[in-house]
Amino acid sequence: MKNLTKTSILNLKQSSTLVINEKCKELILKGKKVYQFGFGQSPFPVPETIVNTLKKNAHRKEYLPIQGLPELRENISNYLAKRTGNDYPKENILITPGSKEAMLLIHIAFNGEIIIPAPGWVSYEPQAEIGSNKVHWLETTRENNWFPTGKELEKKIKSVGKNKNLILILNSPNNPSGAVCKNLEELAKVAKKYKIMVLSDEIYTDLTFNNEYNSISKFYPELSFITGGLSKWCGAGGWRLGFLAVPKKLTEFLKSLKSLASESYSTVNTPTQYASVEAYAHEHNLYKLKVR
C-alpha cells in the first residue's frame, strides 16, 4: 500500500513534553520517585469557586456558539482591557480547547512565515510545520534575558524578507527559560515599522513574581494576537479551556479561524465554559499569590 501519511505530517513526532509527562506517570506507578521538569502542570488545585461552578453546570449538554459563550468572551475582553489597556471586544474573542489549539488554528490559516526566538516552547515549530509555514529561528543571548533586541529582530526581518507575511511568536514569561521580556516596547516599534503580526503567548503572564502583566499589545495592539487560558494560573490544564484575542484589523482573518473551528472541534465543552465565566469574573488575587 502506498504511504498513507502526508509528507508534512510523516516526520511529526509526539510533543516531547507530553511524552515526558506520560513517562513520568508510568515510573510513578512503578513506585519510582520522579522530579518532573517536562510539563507545565500546576501542583495547586483549581480555585474552589470555579470547581463548584463546574459542578453546578455538569448537567449542561447543549452545543454553544462556535466562538464561545458570550458571557465568557465578555469577561475575557474585560480581563484583557484591565491588563493591557486595549479593546479586544467579545466579538474578537475565540474560545478554544486550550491556547495550544488557538495557535494551531492561526498556523493552519496563515499564509506566510514564522519568526521564533530561541529558546522557545517545543510545540511552536511543529505547529508551524503542520500549517506548512516556514520557520526562522532568532537566536537570543543571556545579556538580553533570552529575548531578541530590536536590532536583532530587524536584522532577522530583513534577512527573511521584509515584504513577506510574517508572524513573530513572543512568549513572556518564557517557556522554557522563565524569563520576562523587558524590551517589549522596543520590539513593538520594529514590528510596527515592518507591519508584521505578533502572536503573544500569554499563558504564564498572570504568574510573574512582581504581579505585573506585561503584554506587547500595550504598545502594538493593531496587529497583536493574544492567547491565554486556564492551564497555568488556574491550574486547570486538563480542562482544556483557552482563548484567542484577535485585533480589530484582522476581523476577516478571524472568520477563517471560526470556519476551521467549526469543522474541527465544533465548540469547547459546555460545562467548562460556564465554569470559566466564574474564572474570568474575578481576580482571584489570594489564589494567584499562592501559586506564583
Task: Identify the residue ranges that each predicted region occupies.
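N-terminal small-domain helix-loop-helix segment of the aminotransferase-like
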Residues: 3-97, 279-282
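Helix C-cap/helix->beta junction micro-motif
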Residues: 27-30, 131, 193-194
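Conserved core segment of the aminotransferase class I/II
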Residues: 52, 222-292
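Short acidic capping loops at alpha-helix termini that bridge into adjacent secondary structure
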Residues: 87-93, 112-113, 164, 222-223
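Conserved PLP-anchoring active-site segment centered on the Schiff-base-forming lysine
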Residues: 109-129
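Active-site phosphate-binding strand-loop segment of PLP-dependent enzymes
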Residues: 140-211
